[in-house]
């Protein structure tokens, strides 16, 4: 884990190494200050003049200023190192996530990945900053102060030998109890972020179903779980400072008593006021170093779980990766499913797809229909290798998709997914995801073919209109048409429309299909739809049921051979006829009412 994370230091290695060296210089200077101060006290006691003490006092000021300079420099380098490390770690983690397949994302969940990119990296950054500075400083101060206390205090400083083991035992006991709590709390952070993510992205649904109170309670429960675990941890950690203060202050009382008694009994020959003062000062430094060590242990304990979670992502191998010698060119848009079976998890009991044997020629238009959960989307996801098959093989252009360079394959397989996603930026910028080098004319042509120009031209800024995050400022049908235009700009060999016209009317749907046929005549098209009218002109139509191909044929053939297809077609035609009848009746009633009000023929 440590080796994995330390790889993110890279170009900040110099400042990372410089920080402990500067801290060492700071500590050495600090250790000299009580020693020089003791000599000044003894000089004053012996009646030395100001002139005699000036060299020692000047040296003391010089050492103090040098210590300050070392400390300030260490602070600067520490900040550069920790912030740079966090920046690199975020970059490495985000870059790793970009290589993940859908299966990897399913394993970690998007909310958990967000927590790791934010909260967990912040925790590791804080721990790293403490490790390269305070974790170096505290042990050095403890060792040097302990040594100097024995040099200056002799037997009086033996008290620290009793106190330090007691404090160490207490500290490790607290950490032993706190660590599993911190381990739990970060998993609960995932649940908290998931609640926020679901609520924000689904805000319109929440409000339309008046579920604000339910969502508030759900969020409050997740927040309360985090609070309760943190409170348990803080209750244990609260014992740390009182325990330390009691032990160290008790040690000070014993040192004052023993030191004063020794000064009085020996009349300053064995122990004097200067030695007592320096022993006391070194004791205070020991106290501060112990408190800093306890802070480090607490922070590292908290960050340890975060570090494991980050390392877990960095160490994860993408389930889908490029082969050693990838094929870089897709010959054509032919697709072959060779007895393909697939399940989303190796632990799943049933197959999502079962023994699919299908052959599609290049340029063919294939319609796919089926009930909810019939694995229509799963089938087409395998073509772009968003998932790998469990059994069998999928071939594009006669080559197994696992043998292609992923970028080369996906550049020739354009998908308009069931969930339409737009990104923050202008309409033109979103469309150019299909082709970054597309001219303005090509962008407008793709929008026209997708019937998106009908509403884009109505915006004051046209194609420079800003799209909010997730496309929240455009309707569902508008999003679908923009996503189709984006896919068209790629001019792929295979175009997949996964229920991508469900939010547009049948007239617009027909115009889009006509545009696709004329614009990409040689492109293989797979159209998943719920409306049979969207696929009835396809060369072949696949009827999916329970992860298998139930029937395949053209529209006329399926009306004769497939009961599912025939019933769906009849039902949809009936609903369409009833809808048109209702519209006509409503139109006639409106016209009659208008004529009556105006004193027209209907009134007569």
Residue ranges of predicted features:
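Helix-loop-helix
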Residues: 46-58, 148-162, 171, 232-309, ...
């Amino acid at each position: 884990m440590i080796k994995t994370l330390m790889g993110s230091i890279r170009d900040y290695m110099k400042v990372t190494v410089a920080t402990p060296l500067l801290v060492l210089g700071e500590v050495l200077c600090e250790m000299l200050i009580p020693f020089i101060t003791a000599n000044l006290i003894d000089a004053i006691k012996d009646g030395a003049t100001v002139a005699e003490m000036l060299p020692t006092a000047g040296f003391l000021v010089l050492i103090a200023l040098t210590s300050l300079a070392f400390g300030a420099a260490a602070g600067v380098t520490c900040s550069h190192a920790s912030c740079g490390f966090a920046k690199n770690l975020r970059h490495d983690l985000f870059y790793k996530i970009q290589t993940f397949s859908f299966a990897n994302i399913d394993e970690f969940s998007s909310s958990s990945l967000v927590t790791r990119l934010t909260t967990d990296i912040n925790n590791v950054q804080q721990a790293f900053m403490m490790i390269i500075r305070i974790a170096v400083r505290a042990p050095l101060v403890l060792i040097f102060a302990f040594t100097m206390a024995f040099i200056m205090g002799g037997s009086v400083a033996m008290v620290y030998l009793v106190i330090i083991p007691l404090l160490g035992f207490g500290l490790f006991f607290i950490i032993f109890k706190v660590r599993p709590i911190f381990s739990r709390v970060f998993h609960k952070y995932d649940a908290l972020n998931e609640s926020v993510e679901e609520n924000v992205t689904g805000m319109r649904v929440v409000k339309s179903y008046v579920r604000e109170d339910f969502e508030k309670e759900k969020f409050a429960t997740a927040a309360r779980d985090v609070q309760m675990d943190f409170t348990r941890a803080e209750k244990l950690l609260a014992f740390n400072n009182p325990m330390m203060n009691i032990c160290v202050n008790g040690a000070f009382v014993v040192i004052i008593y023993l030191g004063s008694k020794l000064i009085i009994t020996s009349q300053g020959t064995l122990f004097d006021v200067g030695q007592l003062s320096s022993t006391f000062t070194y004791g205070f430094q020991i106290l501060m170093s112990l408190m800093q060590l306890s802070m480090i242990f607490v922070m590292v304990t908290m960050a340890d779980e975060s570090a494991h979670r980050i390392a877990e992502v960095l160490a994860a191998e993408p389930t889908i990766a490029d082969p050693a010698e990838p094929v870089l060119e897709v010959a054509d848009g032919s697709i072959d499913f060779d007895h393909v079976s697939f399940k989303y998890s190796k632990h799943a009991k049933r197959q999502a797809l079962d023994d699919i044997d299908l052959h599609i020629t290049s340029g063919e238009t294939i319609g796919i229909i089926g009930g909810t959960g019939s694995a229509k989307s799963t089938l087409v996801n395998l073509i772009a290798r968003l998932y790998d098959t469990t059994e069998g093989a999928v071939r594009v252009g006669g080559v197994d998709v696992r043998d292609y360079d992923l970028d080369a394959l996906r550049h020739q397989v354009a998908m308009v997914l069931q969930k339409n996603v737009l990104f923050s930026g202008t309409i033109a910028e979103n469309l150019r995801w299909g082709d970054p080098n597309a001219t303005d004319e090509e962008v407008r042509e793709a929008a026209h073919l997708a019937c998106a120009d009908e509403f884009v031209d109505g915006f004051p800024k046209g194609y420079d209109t800003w799209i909010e995050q997730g496309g929240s400022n455009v309707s569902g049908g508008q999003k679908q048409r923009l996503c189709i235009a984006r896919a068209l700009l790629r001019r792929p060999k295979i175009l997949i429309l996964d229920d991508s016209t469900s939010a547009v009317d049948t007239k617009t749907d027909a115009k889009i299909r006509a545009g696709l046929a004329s614009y990409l005549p040689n492109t293989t098209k797979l159209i998943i739809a719920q409306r049979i009218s969207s696929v009835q002109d396809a060369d072949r139509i696949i009827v999916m049921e329970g992860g298998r191909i139930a029937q395949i044929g053209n529209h006329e053939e399926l009306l004769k051979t497939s009961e599912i297809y025939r019933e769906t077609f009849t039902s949809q035609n009936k609903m369409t006829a009833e809808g048109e009848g209702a519209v006509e009746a409503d139109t006639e009633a409106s016209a009659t009412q208008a004529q009556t009000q105006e004193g027209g023929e209907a009134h007569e």
